[in-house]
């Protein structure tokens, strides 16, 4: 009798101890770069499907940056390329061909060298069929 009681108690303890709640996922907007105080928003462009590229112009007197991040909101977006134009006339293309889901961001893109003054950043992209208007934001640190 004691053995049966001990087995029942052990079974209940194992059942309670092994049960778990599924991981709670944060909504997509929780991953936005905006709340991070150490990142600066350099600009944004709405992708309306009529143009396949846009420029975000940056005030080169403002400051220099080491890293970039792209945030895509509202709709999916196919990013074919990103070209960073520096104040010294050189260019950098980090090979960012990627399909962004709505409300997602890129990995951190390290710029070559140390601190660099950015003149402009060129986005080459396209809307995905069936999607709405996507907003592409450029953040820098």
Whereabouts are the PLM-identified features?
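Short, surface-exposed binding/anchoring microloops in extracellular/periplasmic proteins
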Residues: 48-77
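Exposed aromatic-hydrophobic patches
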Residues: 54-59, 105-113
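Noncatalytic modules at the cell exterior or secretory-pathway interfaces
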Residues: 63-70, 113-128
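Beta-strand-centric surfaces of beta-sandwich/beta-rich domains
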Residues: 49, 81-83, 89-110
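Bacterial N-terminal signal peptides that target proteins for export
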Residues: 1-7
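Short, surface-exposed beta-strand/strand-loop-strand elements in extracellular ectodomains
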Residues: 73-95, 133-140
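Transition segment at domain starts
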Residues: 22-58, 94
